[in-house]
């Protein structure tokens, strides 16, 4: 419609003005129009508070964060904050902050979930919410996002067959930042992922530990070279729903815990709940990816001592091994695992 075209022109003009001011604008839209509009800029100046001043340092300011009402309460808000935190991580600046009035309770709850804390009120009466890379709260994977706890207990592999992997992680081969835009701004495929498996042995990792996502190639020859690590996550929940044929929770409880984060539909989940001997649910927060040309294959893992004779999902990886694999995947480890 003419109205929509005019609206899009206004948005483009706004982007142009923001760019001229040295800002970055991030946008998500769908068939109904604008879904989210986020604007960030770099600063190095004091922040005046009622009763004090925050000294100048290198900061990213979220100057605008608007999410359409139809998306509030959905995963878009979580994804939008995640995307901004990735941008902040890449910038290398000390802090990121945003201002919000107390009545913006939904936004504030999301900020606090991701580790922002209120430093005080500015002179306009807005709360100033800050996150610093020098004071990361590692008590919770959301609060520490996108930084991994340097003192994690152990890591390991999550083995996912290629078909399911490409549904859960459809962006693992995309170039540049298109991946993070796609994952953060897709309501149905947000930052949190759920794996439903039939494992019964104790896992080598726990909640709060990082894991490496291994895409198992299942068709044709060359599995040693085509099966590979594509991404890394941090575990947020481990739920044993069924053990040795014994149901440990009702199917309705299982559905409630999984929500809309599984690649399986309700009927497929019911089949697994009924017929699998064991049922294990691993919920994880997506922290990063290696990207096209950087995926680490089984051959390299084996030649470097990170594979073995046991089932791969049970192989424990210490901090040195985990960092080595990230480095092979062309990840700047010093900007992902920080003290």
Predicted regions and their residues:
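Single conserved hydrophobic/aromatic residue that forms the stacking wall/gate
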Residues: 1-11
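Conserved acetyl-CoA-binding loop-helix of GNAT-fold acetyltransferases
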Residues: 67, 73-87
């Amino acid at each position: 419609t003419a109205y929509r075209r005019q609206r899009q022109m206004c948005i483009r003009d706004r982007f142009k003005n923001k760019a001229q001011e040295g800002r970055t604008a991030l946008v998500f839209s769908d068939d109904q129009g604008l879904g989210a509009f986020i604007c960030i800029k770099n600063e190095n100046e004091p922040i005046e508070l009622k009763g004090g001043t925050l000294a100048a340092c290198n900061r990213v300011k979220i100057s605008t964060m608007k999410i359409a009402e139809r998306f509030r309460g959905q995963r878009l808000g979580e994804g939008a904050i995640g995307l901004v935190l990735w941008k902040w991580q890449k910038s290398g600046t000390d802090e990121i902050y945003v201002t919000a009035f107390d009545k913006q309770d939904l936004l504030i709850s999301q900020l606090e979930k991701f580790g922002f804390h209120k430093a005080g009120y500015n002179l306009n009466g807005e709360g100033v919410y800050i996150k610093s890379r020098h004071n990361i709260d590692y008590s919770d994977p959301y609060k520490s996002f996108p930084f991994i706890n340097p003192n994690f207990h152990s890591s390991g592999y999550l083995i996912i067959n290629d078909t399911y992997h490409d549904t859960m992680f459809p962006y693992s081969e995309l170039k540049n930042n298109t991946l993070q835009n796609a994952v953060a701004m897709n309501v149905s495929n947000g930052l949190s992922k759920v794996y439903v498996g039939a494992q019964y042995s104790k896992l080598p990792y726990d909640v709060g530990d990082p894991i490496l996502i291994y895409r198992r190639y299942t068709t044709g020859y060359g599995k040693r070279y085509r099966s590979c690590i594509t991404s890394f996550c941090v575990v947020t929940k481990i739920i044993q729903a069924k053990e040795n044929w014994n149901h440990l929770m009702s199917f309705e409880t299982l559905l409630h815990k999984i929500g809309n984060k599984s690649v399986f539909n309700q009927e497929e989940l019911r089949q697994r709940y009924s017929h699998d001997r064991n049922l294990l649910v691993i919920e994880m927060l997506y922290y990063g990816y290696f990207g096209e040309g950087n995926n680490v294959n089984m051959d390299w893992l084996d030649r470097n001592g990170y594979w073995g004779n046991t089932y791969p999902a049970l192989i424990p990886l210490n901090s040195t091994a985990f960092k080595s694999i990230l480095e092979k995947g062309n990840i700047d480890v010093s900007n992902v695992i920080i003290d």
